[in-house]
Amino acid sequence: MNETIETQMLDALELFHYAHRFRQHQFVLVLDDGARLEQLMLDIRVLYSSHIKIVILYRADQSIGDCLDRWGQRGFRFHHLASQSPEQALEVLDRDRDWEEVAVIGLDLSSDQEAEALTRQSLQIAKALGAAKVFFLGEQKGLSLGDRFLSHPRPDELEGYLNQGTPLNMVPSRLWIMIAEARRSGIEIVILEAKSGTLFEEIFTHRGSGTLLTEDYPNEIRLGREGDLTDLLMLIRHEMQQGSILPISEESIAANIQNYFVYTVNAAIVASATLVDYGDSAELAKFCTLPRYQGKGRARQLAIQMIERAAELKKDYVFALSVNPKMWDFFLGLGFEETSREELSQSWQAQYDFSRPSRAFKKSVANGKVAC
């Protein structure tokens, strides 16, 4: 099969996978200062075509009428309600939830602190609608601490920054409102730049785009199961494209899925790795973590679970290989020692491409030695 066509089909599979996951979910889009609806229209049309329910909220003094008229003439209909109080907006939305158009509501906010009022009222409306996600679209890519971008900060982490007076690129009072509502209602809040493609990347790809604020979801490590196949394929595929891990077919993943260890956050797979049996030893392989969830110790927890499992299986040692210098430090930090690839299992050597510039690491687990 032509590789380009296969890549296109996998891209389509990823899109349909996420579209199916969010089908009939309610999303609320909030236009902050600097957000232009025109720049978001292609994203909104993709969401609408994916049968995601959309409500767009904006301050009534923002001018978006020309954009709505232009797209209405092109056949994309909006249900537009200008200059509504939050109470009126809720009444209309609650009464007419079955309309097929995208609802666009201008909120009349009689407050000196309009940014805070827009944040608070938008979240209250989203909660009343049972929305799954609220997207605040503005001039910033997301939250940042100096040059450090915060893709998925924990609520307690953000509270620490705010209590210490650490400068972030958002008015603290708005951020406090968001943290409180995420914890209280469980709504996922996304802070995102209002430009074409950002909503699509945030919703329909593994990468994400902005900053995601959530409550402290339950985390779990478990073994893979058949229903995980597409999630694992999407997760592993991008690491293969970058050359970080060796290619593996969907059939191979399916055949060995019970040997995959997956890390879930609120039941969604965010990281994975697999334990491959080689008789007296086992390989820790295929480490993958969604970009938003990297750097938070999840891969380490997966590795520890696999090392413990290898010890339970009475293996003499575990080993791992990587071409990535960050992974070299990762394995050394787990108590592995660098070794020659020729010192590893003969059955592993028989199927390995030694032209690959990988480095090998080994750790004894004989007699139950699993300390990391």
Could you say what each language-model-derived stretch is?
Residues 354-372:
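Acidic/histidine-enriched, glycine/proline-rich intrinsically disordered or flexible terminal extensions
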Residues 310-323:
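Conserved GNAT acetyl-CoA-binding A-motif
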Residues 289, 295-310:
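Conserved acetyl-CoA-binding loop-helix of GNAT-fold acetyltransferases
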